[in-house]
């Protein structure tokens, strides 16, 4: 087979796996379509691929950057990293507010997926959801404070009691 045909097949398989992960993350209606465009021959081949997304039924798939919200982008990245976890060589993944715009049940699923990914990579996650924080191996409290007109960030590793108190504070 030609490299382009092999890429197309691999891209469809990849999109199917990512779609399955996104369904788990409370995005059951997402459609992912690999789109190939010819380009000047280079070390990566003669075409480039862009993943098009439709987050809601009836929408035409479009480039991710043009339609996905912050929460959708975060969950999509988490889904992609989950699919690639066994072959990816990234040592540390950072998710900053991966919980943006999601409900409690979706947050729990995101937390479970983060825990799964953490088996093959170190995961750092900034979250405001107790469902995610409760599933972490370690819990750091990050506080910003202003002193003498300057902002400082303080990061503290919480012990068991501190963690319980912080989870209670997050819940309200």
Regions found by a protein language model. Name each.
Residues 96-97:
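Walker B catalytic acidic pair
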Residues 51, 55-57, 71-93, 117:
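GG-anchored amphipathic helix commonly corresponding to the ABC/SMC/Rad50 NBD signature/C-loop
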Residues 87-88, 100-108:
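Conserved D-loop-proximal element of ABC-family nucleotide-binding domains
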Residues 105-172:
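C-terminal lobe/lid and adjacent interdomain/linker elements of RecA-like ASCE P-loop ATPase modules
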């Amino acid at each position: 087979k030609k490299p382009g045909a092999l890429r197309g097949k691999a891209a469809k398989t990849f999109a199917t796996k990512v779609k399955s992960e996104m369904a788990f993350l409370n995005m059951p209606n997402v459609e992912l379509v690999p789109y190939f465009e010819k380009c000047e021959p280079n070390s990566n081949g003669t075409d480039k691929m862009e993943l098009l997304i439709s987050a809601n039924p009836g929408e035409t798939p479009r480039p991710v950057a043009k339609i996905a919200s912050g929460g959708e982008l975060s969950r999509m990245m988490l889904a992609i990293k989950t699919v690639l976890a066994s072959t990816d060589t990234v040592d540390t993944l950072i998710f900053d507010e991966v919980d943006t715009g999601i409900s409690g049940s979706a947050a729990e699923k995101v937390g479970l997926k983060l825990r799964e990914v953490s088996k093959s990579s170190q995961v750092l996650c900034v979250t405001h959801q107790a469902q995610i924080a409760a599933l972490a191996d370690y819990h750091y409290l990050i506080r910003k404070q202003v002193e003498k007109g300057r902002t400082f960030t303080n990061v503290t590793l919480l012990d068991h009691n501190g963690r319980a108190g912080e989870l209670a504070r997050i819940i309200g």
